[in-house]
C-alpha cells in the first residue's frame, strides 16, 4: 500500500505545474450549467473535462523518457499502475465534489430549484461517465503513449456529445430512467457501483499487462544494445 501511495504522490508531483489549468477547466462547466440551467449537464461536462486531463501524467512521462526510470524503481509494475489509477480517481472525486458544491449554488442564484434528488442523480451520472471515459483512456495511454494515443484524449468529448444527443433525442427514455431512479434509487446505486468496479478491475488488469510488456521490451532492447 505504501508503494501505491508513493506512486500516487509521484503523479501529483508530475502534474503539479498543471494545477492552475486543471482548476480553470472546472470553471467552464459552471458557466455551462448556468447557461443550460441543468445540474446534470453541468456535472457531466465537468467530468468530461477532468477526464481529458488524464493524459497529463503520460505526456510528462513520455517527454522526459521516464519509462526506464520506472523500470529500475524498487516498485512492482502493478503498484505503479494502481497508484496512477488512484491519482486519476482522486482527481475525478475532487472535481465531482467541487462541481456538486459550486454548480447548485450558481443555479440557485439564478432562481433554479436544485433538490437532493438532482444532486444524487448528477453525482451518479458524473461518476459513471468519468469511469466510462477513463477505463478506456488509461490502458490506451499505456499501450500507445500520449502522442500516438492522443485520440484517447477525445473519448470524453465524444462520450459527452453522445450523452447530450441521447438526452435531447430520446426524452421518453430519459423519463423512464428518471422513473426507475425514483422508484428504486438503492438498486440503481448498487448497479452503478458494481458496473464501475468491474470496469476498473478489467481496465487495471489490462494496464498492468501492458506496463509489464512495455518494460520487458525496454529491458530486451537495452540488453541487445550492450551486446
Question: What kind of feature is each model-predicted range?
Answer:
Residues 1-65, 83-227:
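Hydrophobic alpha-helical transmembrane segments of membrane proteins
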Residues 72-77:
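Short helix-to-coil transition segments within interhelical loops
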Residues 79-81:
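Alpha-helix N-cap/helix-start motif at helix boundaries, enriched for small hydrophobics
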Amino acid at each position: 500500500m505504501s508503494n501505491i501511495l508513493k506512486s500516487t504522490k509521484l503523479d501529483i508531483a508530475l502534474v503539479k505545474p498543471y494545477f492552475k489549468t486543471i482548476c480553470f477547466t472546472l470553471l467552464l462547466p459552471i458557466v455551462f450549467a448556468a447557461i443550460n440551467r441543468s445540474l446534470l449537464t453541468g456535472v457531466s461536462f465537468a467530468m468530461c473535462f477532468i477526464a481529458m486531463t488524464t493524459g497529463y501524467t503520460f505526456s510528462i512521462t513520455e517527454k522526459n523518457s521516464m519509462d526506464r526510470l520506472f523500470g529500475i524503481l524498487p516498485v512492482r509494475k502493478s503498484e505503479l499502475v494502481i497508484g496512477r489509477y488512484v491519482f486519476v480517481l482522486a482527481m475525478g472525486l475532487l472535481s465531482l465534489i467541487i462541481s456538486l458544491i459550486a454548480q447548485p449554488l450558481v443555479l440557485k442564484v439564478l432562481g433554479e430549484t436544485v433538490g437532493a434528488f438532482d444532486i444524487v442523480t448528477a453525482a451518479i451520472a458524473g461518476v459513471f461517465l468519468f469511469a466510462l471515459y477513463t477505463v478506456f483512456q488509461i490502458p490506451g495511454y499505456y499501450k500507445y503513449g500520449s502522442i500516438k494515443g492522443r485520440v484517447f484524449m477525445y473519448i470524453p468529448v465524444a462520450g459527452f456529445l453522445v450523452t447530450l444527443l441521447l438526452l435531447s433525442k430520446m426524452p421518453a427514455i430519459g423519463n423512464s430512467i428518471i422513473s426507475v431512479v425514483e422508484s428504486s434509487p438503492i438498486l440503481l446505486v448498487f448497479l452503478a457501483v458494481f458496473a464501475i468496479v468491474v470496469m476498473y478491475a478489467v481496465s487495471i488488469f489490462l494496464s498492468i499487462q501492458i506496463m509489464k510488456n512495455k518494460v520487458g521490451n525496454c529491458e530486451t532492447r537495452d540488453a541487445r544494445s550492450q551486446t
